Curated annotation (Swiss-Prot):
This is Probable cytochrome c oxidase subunit 3. It comes from Rickettsia felis (strain ATCC VR-1525 / URRWXCal2). CDD domains: Cyt_c_Oxidase_III (cd01665). It is found in: Cell membrane. InterPro entries: Cyt_c/ubiquinol_Oxase_su3, Cyt_c_oxase_su3_dom, Cyt_c_oxidase-like_su3, Cyt_c_oxidase_su3-like_sf, Cyt_c_oxidase_su3_a-hlx. GO terms for cellular component: plasma membrane. The chain crosses the membrane at residues 21-41, 46-66, 89-109, 174-194, 212-232, 256-276. It holds the Pfam family COX3. Belongs to the cytochrome c oxidase subunit 3 family. SUPFAM superfamilies: Cytochrome c oxidase subunit III-like (SSF81452). The keyword Chloroplast does not apply. Its main location: membrane. GO terms for molecular function: cytochrome-c oxidase activity.
Length: 278
């Protein structure tokens, strides 16, 4: 990013991105993270150090990259109308890929539940016609899962409140609503961790357990990412970065999209994995 650039003198509305080290550095950081993750799963020597280095490297690269994007929008005013449109399309496509991810998890769950004979029948003991397997003690869907459903539905309401407050140029209500949404996200994650801790089955306890932890755990990771996203928006809102005109509030808009997506996915998980699956 060149601080001496003067985008006002451009003869077009598009953003020609300056050379950046973050894409390639993020790629190497992700490689380190994957190596660390595999090493941790297999118990290799120094696995925790490699995994920690990968997490820190990815976090630093993403922070630095997004910091530059924010500066390009606020300081350099590079986020013109065509650029904002392109960013919105990119975010929509990203959410579409996430839908495909969860679609695969649901397909695996339905394959196992509607026809409970696993492909790895010799490894995982699954009795035909019985779902969930008799060795699995499932969760009561109207205990912690129902509470978590109410938490996420309420958080969807508060993030919408924050959006409307921003549109009305009410910074105080916007910041308050974002703070409530963040607290609800943290509460959800805490309840999910409590549920996992007291679960009667492990990830390796068969096809039901692997499907359950993969789907709900992947969603839980998205809640954590979304909460971090909202925390960044909270501090930016307090600083007065978001407006209703000009460069607008793309960061907040994308965080709200992402959070609503997480809410909808949980409703499907609650309905099919917890209620139908039990």
């Amino acid at each position: 990013m060149n601080p001496n650039s003067h985008p006002i003198t451009k003869s077009h509305l598009f953003h020609i991105v300056d050379p950046s080290p973050w894409p390639v550095l993020t790629s190497f950081a992700l490689l380190l993270l994957v190596i660390g993750g595999v090493s941790f799963m297999h118990g290799y020597k120094f696995n925790i150090y490699i995994l920690s280095a990968g997490v820190i490297s990815v976090g630093y690269c993403l922070y630095s990259w997004w910091r530059d994007v924010v500066k390009e929008g606020i300081v350099e005013h590079q986020h013109t109308s065509p650029v904002r449109k392109g960013l919105q399309i990119g975010m929509a496509l990203f959410i579409l890929t996430e839908i495909v991810f969860f679609g695969v998890f649901f397909a695996s769950f339905f394959k196992s539940s509607l026809s409970p004979v696993g492909l790895l029948d010799g490894v995982w003991v699954v009795k035909q016609g019985i779902w969930p397997p008799p060795t699995i003690k499932t969760f009561d869907p109207f205990d912690i899962p129902f509470i978590n459903t109410l938490i996420l539905l309420l958080s969807g309401t508060t993030v919408t409140w924050a959006h409307y407050a921003l549109e009305e140029k009410n910074q105080k209500d916007c910041v308050t609503a974002l703070a409530l949404t963040i607290l609800l996200g943290i509460f959800f994650t805490t309840m999910q961790a409590y549920e996992y801790y007291h679960a009667a089955f492990k990830f390796t306890d068969g096809i039901y357990a692997s499907n359950f932890y993969l789907a709900t755990g992947f969603h839980g990771a998205h809640v954590i990412i979304g909460t971090i996203f909202l925390i960044v928006c909270y501090f930016r809102a307090k600083r007065g970065d978001f407006t209703t005109e000009g460069n607008g509030h793309l960061g907040f808009e994308f965080a709200a999209w992402y959070w609503h997506f997480v809410d909808v996915v949980w409703l499907f998980l609650f309905t099919f994995v917890y209620i139908f699956g039990s």
